[in-house]
């Protein structure tokens, strides 16, 4: 770089001081991103965006043992080489809607990493938190049967099962997870109580930022514990009345696949000098033990049954053992549930 003397108007002074600094090689970082997985995630997100005419599609892949982020994709996105040029109609319309002096607002919308900065109601994927907490706290009796009549009434409010038109009837805990049966999870939330459920929500990392090494991370939105009544407890139990970021949810569920250990998400695993030699390694960080290894193993079997026998059959891959949980939540707009607007998700291990 070149440093010169200027006057108050920014004009160079002829007899001023001039100093030149040679360019120096910068240091580097080694990311946890797997370029092959990232490529597949980008293509899958684009395909889902087009096929479903979605407003946004988001995908994260994480190694549950280390917290390493292996892929992170979101559509629509932008070209980093031309960051102010919209490459999707959605952003073109957004840019056109702003005056030149306010276009920065549209750019922020385009550049924002929604996987860490936006919250959403997780819907039934959150049932894994309620289910795992219930197993850990032994609030489910061995071989216990639950009954779904299509709805449950809490404090005078009727809460429907998604299949209220054809109730699930008698079902085990495992079948209730497979069926994503709301009334059963209302019952589990009641058995846990507000205090214990909130303890687990906190233990799973859903009340604080994950600490991922990216700027702009948002935190979850949920009721203060003292403000949670029977109705709020019921809806939180099956994933409503709580909003989390995608990175928070995948980190929480990854702990179930990691013998109950919650890891901090990691994006940088090493620093290098200008010749590529590693100067510092970033070790995986265990945040806490959330549940026991035994509970973790039980829940992995339950999650596997969702893919083999439940609502996640579409994710089944011959030759592989997969577990997961589907989720569908009504989109919240201006503080109200919007009719016909949904957030559909799937989380798997």
Language-model regions: role of each:
Residues 7-20, 24, 33, 65-125, ...:
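Beta-lactam-recognizing serine transpeptidase/beta-lactamase-like catalytic domain environment
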């Amino acid at each position: 770089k070149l440093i010169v003397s200027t006057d108050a108007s920014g004009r160079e002074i002829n007899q001023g001081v001039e100093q030149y600094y040679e360019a120096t090689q910068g240091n580097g970082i080694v990311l946890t991103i797997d370029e092959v997985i990232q490529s597949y995630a980008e293509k899958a997100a684009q395909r889902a965006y087009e096929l479903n005419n979605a407003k946004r599609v988001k995908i994260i892949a994480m190694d549950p043992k280390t917290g390493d982020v292996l892929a992170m994709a979101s559509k629509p996105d932008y070209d980093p080489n031309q960051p102010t040029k919209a490459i999707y109609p959605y952003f073109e319309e957004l840019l056109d809607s702003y005056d030149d002096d306010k276009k920065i607002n549209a750019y922020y919308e385009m550049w924002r990493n929604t996987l860490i900065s936006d919250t959403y109601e997780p819907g039934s994927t959150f049932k894994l938190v309620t289910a795992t907490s219930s197993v850990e706290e032994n609030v489910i009796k061995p071989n216990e049967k639950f009954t779904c009549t299509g709805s449950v009434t809490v404090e005078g409010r009727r809460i429907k099962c998604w299949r209220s038109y054809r109730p699930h009837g008698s079902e085990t805990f495992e079948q209730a997870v497979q069926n994503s049966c709301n009334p059963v999870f209302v019952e589990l939330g009641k058995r846990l109580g507000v205090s214990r459920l909130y303890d687990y929500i906190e233990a799973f990392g859903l009340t604080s930022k994950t600490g991922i090494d990216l700027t702009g991370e948002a935190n979850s939105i949920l009721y203060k514990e003292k403000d949670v009544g029977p109705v709020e407890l019921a809806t939180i139990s099956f994933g409503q009345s709580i909003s989390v970021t995608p990175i928070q949810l995948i980190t929480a569920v990854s702990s179930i696949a990691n013998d109950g250990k919650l890891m901090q998400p990691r994006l940088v695993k090493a620093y290098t000098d200008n010749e590529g030699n590693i100067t510092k390694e970033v070790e995986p960080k265990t945040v806490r033990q959330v549940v026991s290894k035994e509970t973790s193993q039980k829940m992995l079997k339950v999650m596997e049954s969702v893919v083999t026998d439940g609502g996640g059959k579409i994710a089944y891959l011959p030759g592989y053992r997969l577990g997961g949980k589907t989720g569908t939540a009504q989109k919240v707009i201006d503080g109200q549930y919007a009719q016909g607007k949904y957030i559909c998700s799937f989380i798997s291990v």
